[in-house]
Regions:
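N-terminal amphipathic/basic-hydrophobic helices that include classical n-h-c signal peptides
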Residues: 1-3
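Bacterial N-terminal signal peptides
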Residues: 13-24
Length: 140
């Protein structure tokens, strides 16, 4: 009877250790993409030179951002010289086509907008005022 009790206690201990190990790993696995901040490049409204299509690094930083479903995307206008938007959709040439998934409206320098995606996928976005400013949010 003592041997069975010892095995039962050992089994419970092993299960507890496995559960504790899994729980401690879960936050680290999701923390990488729980939130992301996207900012505008300074003076990106004055010139298209920041645009990737013009050989620049992109007018938003990062140009491609990744976040988990339920994570928080913070979009901030850090450009002290201009008003910008972060509007979901695409641009064909200079013809914007919003898709209604998110739209910050006009953000003055220092203003921010938060969006919490609920569906995975690729979300292209652009600035309604400066159509060369484009980026993509990948939601996993």
């Amino acid at each position: 009877m003592g041997l069975m009790k010892t095995k039962a206690i050992s089994s419970i201990f092993v299960l507890f250790a496995i559960a504790a190990g899994m729980a401690s790993m879960a936050p680290a696995a999701f923390a990488d993409h729980a939130e992301v901040t996207i900012v505008t490049v300074d003076e990106s409204g004055f010139s298209q030179t920041c645009a990737a299509s013009q050989g620049g690094p992109g007018c938003y930083t990062p140009v491609t951002a990744t976040v988990d479903v339920g994570g928080v995307v913070t979009m901030t206008n850090t450009d002290p010289t201009g008003v910008h938007t972060f509007t979901s959709g695409t641009v064909d040439g200079f013809a914007p086509s919003p898709d209604g998934k998110f739209d910050t409206g006009m953000l003055m320098s220092g203003d921010s907008f938060e969006w919490t995606p609920t569906v995975s996928g690729e979300y292209p976005y652009y600035c309604m005022l400066h159509a060369w400013q484009v980026g993509t949010i990948t939601v996993n």
